[in-house]
Amino acid sequence: MRVLMVAQSPIAGDSRILREVAALTGAGHVVHVVGRDVPEGFTLEGGATVESVSRSAGLRGGSGPAVGHGQRGAKVLVQRFGRWLLLPEHRLRTEKQWRTAAAATLSGLEPFEVVHAHDFNTLELAAAFASRWSATLVYDSHELWFDRALPGRPTPLWRVRGRRSELALARQAAVVFTVSDGIARRLRERGLPDVRVIRNTFPRPEVAPSLPSAPTGLLYAGRVGAGRDLPAVVEAARLLAPFPTLLMGSVDPNYRLDLGSVQKVPETSIDEVDRVLQESGISLVTLTNTCENHRLALPNKLFHAVRAGVPVVAADLPELRAVITRYHLGTLYTPGDGASLAAAVRSLIADYAGYVDGVRAAGDELNWEHDAEVLVSAYSALAKPPANAH
């Protein structure tokens, strides 16, 4: 089938979309992606094509260091209050501007048989073009969209109306995908009967992971920004010193944090992250307990650690707890509590070999080859004519 994927995320860095594209082209589908800020010369696997629609970068702060000592003073407080007040409208405006530009791009394309919407901020656009082309709509909910912790002033009415809109639009989809059992249950409770889970797992490694007999450090590899519980990481690093704590990842604009004894290391390729994870021996999967989306999340870094064969210390949130305890992947800490995080690290070190064995065994199930089959099977069913067709 001819498949159009639509996403407002930067495609080059969205591993879920890249893996889904590869799985579908590998199954014989023709895939075109319209995404955000695609780098010049960027290509996709399997002959899939991609084109870019740019989006406003958002409200910008000062030009000071992104990770370091926070700025203070009356002027800074006024600026922060202004951002807090205006950010919700600005976020909606930039997303709408992207959809308007993307609609013009889509209008110039030949019709597709399937329109695959990645996240709610593309769902209305995707549904409109699926209807125009008499195509099948697929909704891929990477997050529990209206239950996220967002910067800026509270917007309770937007959340209530948004959930209603999401339900009305998603009911037009032939199938809905999401990233965890917890989010799937919540979407079903809200009225979507067919929700299937495709976790953000990684392909199995070609070579079995090699780890030290005892861990030599902690690694946080992921986005550096609000909601990642990094102040707790900094406090735990102080309590665990001189045991090294490393931080690797892109830094959100305007995010300020005094890293203390945490060592910032350069970003690198996914394969190189595997190596650093394996050399350190422990992966940090940290989140704040500030929203339902976090409580039901299964972050990429959990499955990256499984691919690398590395045990985790993770936030004690319902969905993370369920997976980590089921597979014996590591230990849990109370979000926001650096002392709890440090204690969880010590507990993991005390039974390190046992957790390594658990991660190794979990790799047989927690891998992209397993999850890709859910996607490919669903598309195979979409390609079949209805039983009553003549």
Predicted ranges, named:
Residues F177, S210-R228, V234-R238, L375:
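Conserved donor-binding/catalytic core segment of Leloir-type glycosyltransferases
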Residues M1-R55, V175, R199, A232-L240, ...:
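N-terminal subdomain of nucleotide-sugar transferases
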Residues E20, P88-S107, E124, A128-R132, ...:
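Membrane-proximal helix-turn-helix segments that form the acceptor-binding/catalytic region
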Residues R326-Y327, T331-G338, V345-A353:
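Conserved acidic donor-binding segment of nucleotide-sugar-dependent glycosyltransferases
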Residues G182, T201:
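Carbohydrate-associated surface elements
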Residues A350-S380:
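A charged, aromatic-enriched C-terminal amphipathic alpha-helix characteristic of glycosyltransferases
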Residues F243, G249-L277, I282:
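Nucleotide-activated donor-binding/catalytic signature segment of Leloir-type glycosyltransferases, i.e.
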Residues S283-T286, H304-A314:
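Short hydrophobic beta-strand element within catalytic cores of glycosyltransferases
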